Each structure stands twice: as C-alpha cells, then as structure tokens.
Amino acid sequence: MELQVTNNFSDITSEILALAKMSEQAGSIAPELYTQYDVKRGLRDLNGKGVLAGLTNISDVRATKIVNGEAVPAHGQLFYRGYNVEDLVRGFSKDNRFGFDEVTYLLLFNKLPNKEELESFSRLLNSYRSLPTSFVRDIIMKAPSKDMMNTLARSVLTLYSYDDRADDVSLPNVLRQCLQLISLCPMLSIYGYQAYSHYHDGNSLYIHQPSQTLSMAENILHILRPDSSYTPLEAKILDIALILHMEHGGGNNSSFTTRVVTSSLSDTYSVCLLYTS
C-alpha cells in the first residue's frame, strides 16, 4: 500500500535544475590544487592509504602484511581490545553461550567480565529494552520511510524528546544513554521494517514485545518473525554477525564523523544519528 502524496513537496522544477547547475559551477575546485596544498581527499593519501586521524586501542583491522617492503593482501584479522575476535567467538561457542553482551562489555570497559559482572551487565541491558509509551504508534508507524537507515535515524533523534537529561554530557549519563541505545536500536530497526512492510508492501503488521530472558540475537529474531520462531543455529549465527559488526578500527566515515561531533560536546542522540545515517 503506497502512501498518498498530496502536494508537490518532492518536485524538481526547471528552476531548481538551473540553480543546481549554477551551484555546481560555483563550487568546483581545480583537482591540481589538492596536490598543490597536500589536501587529503576522503581521508586517503595520494598513495591510497588511510590518513592517520587519531589513536585507538578499541579495535584493529589487519588486512595486509609486509612482503619485501610492500603491503600485500592477507587473511583478514579483527581485534577487539587486543583480543583476536576469532578467539573470542571460539571461547563462547565452545561453552554454548551467546557472546554479544560479553563483547559489548569488553569494548566499553577494556576487560572481559567475570560471571557475576556479565550477569549484572546483561540484566542492565535487558532492563533498558523498553521504548517510551506509545512510541511505536506515534513515531514509527506515522509517515514510515522506505529507507531503513532513515527510519532508524529519525527514531533515535526523537528519543531526545523523551529524555529529561538529553543534554547532560557527563560520563555516567552518556554511558546510560549509550547502553539504552544499544538495547533499543534493534527494536527501532525491526519496528521500522514492520511499518515499511505493512504500509508500503501491504503485508500484515506484527509487533512483538521483547523478552527479558532472551539474548540480543534471540530477541531480534523473536521480534522480527511473524510467529517469533527461530532455530538455535540462526540465533548463534546472528550473535556472531552482530559481534563482527560492532567495531572496525574507527576509521570509516561514520566513526570519524562521530568522533569529530562528539568533541564538540553534542548530545548523545545527535551523535548516534550521524552514526546511523
């Protein structure tokens, strides 16, 4: 079912086309000037390598090795806080448990939690897995977008209005906000998808509440599926996929932009909006 557009809000007129051409001409810069002034375009040097823009010990991606003084492709390795992710996955897979909460703890606090710390942290994340009253109806279901990243960004930014301490950038408050967003973003994404599927594709609408006893991966599948069904293998594979996408060195566009905006003491929701865009 397509949403009806009742105005010319999206029209690109001949006047706009003419102005766009003028704007393009007015904003052009001769390519040779980038070389003359040693300007790094797209965070890349002239040799194609990345530009050093900061330091981090959170994660590291190794995709090359040095052979005869030259960097050549190698079997990729991903490290979180010095731990090879393959070793982390092997550890909790051997014990037949989910690793999302444990690796989240590691990335945030630079240590692997013991059993008591992990159980307490998991309970905290579960307690944050609840959206404000009528948020799904009033925010997500109204004017649903065809673009899932747009839906997620809009929902995250709207949470600002529900937070009495939205502009408090003290460490305890920012940590609280970030942990809440970690718990809520999967829900925002799935509910946004359900709205899209219903209003744009004409499918039946299913809205399931998360469970306080399921892992992150299990909850995603539980909320996503019409009948909430999933296999243990599906949940384990999704858990690993979530872990692999947690961090990637901090050098991509969204991470770099987030670090720049965070340094200006922007609120957490606006920073997260940039990361989800």
What role is predicted for each listed range?
Residues K236-S270:
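Helix-hairpin-helix/helix-loop-helix acidic hairpins
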Residues R90-K94, K111, L125-N126, Y206-S211, ...:
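A short, ordered amphipathic alpha-helix with a cationic face
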